[in-house]
């Protein structure tokens, strides 16, 4: 599969302040996650002349130029079935067609499969072929992914990491940062990181933390300057997961062992 990655400067808190747009296929290509209109992406799109436009999920730093490029290329605009209305609200344009996990989109280099990868967002999908996948905000090469309400679901996120790891890809292509050429190690690291954080959240509650802020302070031993809001969202997602699994009680404000 021919893969072109074009980093696009956006108002994102992802690594490098950019979102990766991708073009898959040397003919009848798919443009994925066109976050903004830039000269570099214009040039790449002009060379590839994509037949399809799609996104991994609807967050603003992934959809900013969807309508522009779908119109400019006269391309088929895709959205996830059952999320078409949310897609239209996020992009300002209705999809031409919808897909479901397991569906495939044809390119000149072969078919691209839609893989269900919720967690960072409910509608999140990856676009996979035999050796790789565009994975959006499921994974990053360095650091971790924010998973928090209202869109995030920690149980779903962990399942998605395991699902992708089972595919044994050679490379995966994230929404932010460099290409990941060691997918198994990276996905294992992200899983371990989340499970370790779950244990620190559980321990904080066991030791008397009750409010989200108290759990946050007890679960993290590093300086959270500039990212405290992101860490707070992640703590909420962990508390929700633990509550659903019966490990503690959490009403959205207070946790009890």
Model-assigned labels for residue ranges:
Residues 191-208, 234:
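Positively charged, polyanion-binding regions of nucleic-acid-associated proteins
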Residues 30-32, 54, 113, 132-134, ...:
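Residue-level marker for buried hydrophobic side chains located in beta-strands
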Residues 6, 23, 102-129:
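Core dinuclear metal-dependent hydrolase active-site scaffold
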């Amino acid at each position: 599969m021919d893969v072109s990655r074009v980093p696009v400067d956006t108002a994102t808190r992802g690594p490098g302040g950019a979102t990766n747009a991708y073009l898959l296929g040397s003919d009848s290509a798919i443009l994925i996650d066109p976050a903004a209109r830039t000269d570099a992406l214009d040039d790449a799109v002009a060379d590839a002349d994509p037949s399809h436009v799609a996104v991994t999920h609807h967050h603003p730093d992934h959809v900013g130029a969807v309508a522009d490029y779908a119109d400019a290329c006269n391309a088929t605009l895709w959205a996830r079935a059952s999320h078409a209305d949310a897609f239209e609200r996020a992009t300002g344009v209705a999809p031409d067609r919808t897909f479901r996990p397991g569906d495939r989109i044809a390119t000149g280099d072969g078919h691209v499969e839609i893989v269900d990868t919720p967690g960072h967002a409910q509608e999140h999908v990856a676009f996979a072929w035999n050796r790789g996948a565009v994975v959006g905000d499921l994974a990053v090469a360095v650091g971790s992914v924010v998973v928090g309400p209202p869109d995030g679901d920690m149980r779903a996120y962990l399942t998605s990491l395991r699902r992708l790891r089972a595919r044994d890809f050679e490379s995966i292509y994230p929404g932010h940062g460099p290409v990941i050429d060691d997918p198994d190690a990276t996905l294992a690291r992200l899983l371990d990181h989340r499970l370790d954080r779950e244990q620190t959240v559980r321990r904080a509650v066991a030791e008397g933390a009750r409010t989200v802020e108290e759990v946050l302070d007890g679960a993290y031993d590093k300086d959270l300057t500039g990212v405290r809001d992101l860490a707070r969202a992640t703590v909420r997602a962990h508390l929700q997961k633990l509550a659903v699994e019966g490990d503690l009680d959490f009403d959205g404000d207070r946790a009890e062992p």
